[in-house]
């Protein structure tokens, strides 16, 4: 079978591997679509905090069940599914409290362990979710939506909250979509105006703030909020400058959610946290309930996830997909590979 591998930063190769052999309690899956996550792109660029090499990327995917044992989840061969790619130990303090997304030994596919970008993989049955008739392309987008949705849930967003999402990549846009679904007034900010405007127009967001300078950014924040700033700010980039922007744009008593993953350290005036009495939340991975709730939400027709896909490549074009995405990240929103 064919497998995509990142040998080192900037080097993607398609290699031949033996078919995986499933163990008891696992299913054999045929991968149908895989989305290139920002962390996969970071691994390709050498900027992802958890990257090691060589690495098979991919944790956003859909698949067809080829072989599976009898199970109590009603999963059968031929079903189109998606999966939870965050492997937890089940024994640490976090896992014991049900916070499996915060497992101290977490291994996410494509990051701490090899990912799904092969023609076939095996997967523990308990990590497989029935796609309920959603298309294979849509199901490959459920996992990034879960990342955003989990972060939004941390903020306890209320109807008419003023929300600012910084970062118009996949996670940021889907965070905006999730906040909008909760009745909030949602604005998005980015340095790439075309990408920002695409998100606003495609998903009916309330507006945008071009982050071309700190001064212009704050001026627009004040104009939009009548000087009151935002009830919720969401960092979906992973840079020190955008973290600072979230703090600066937050109202007194606001909630700030950190979803973006970065590699850099940052010095900032921490007294702003005290002065504004900010509630700052980290958000990591997602939970089973996020997957189940979002599959149902998308199935209801309230959200069209496929609108986020701007580019689709075939498996044999994997190297080109990574090259193009790396060079054109300012204009390419979600890139998927058809297997």
Which residue ranges define each predicted feature?
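Glycine-rich beta-strand-centered segment in the early N-terminal region that forms part
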Residues: 20-34, 47-93, 132-134
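NAD(P)H dinucleotide-binding glycine-rich loop of Rossmann-like/cofactor-binding domains
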Residues: 89-166
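Mid-domain Rossmann-like dinucleotide-binding core that forms the NAD(H)/NADP(H) cofactor-binding site
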Residues: 134-213
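Glycine-rich cofactor phosphate-binding loops and adjacent beta1-alpha1 units
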Residues: 201-279
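C-terminal hydrophobic helical "lid"/dimerization subdomain
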Residues: 244-248, 288-339
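Rossmann-fold dehydrogenase core element
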Residues: 255, 268-307
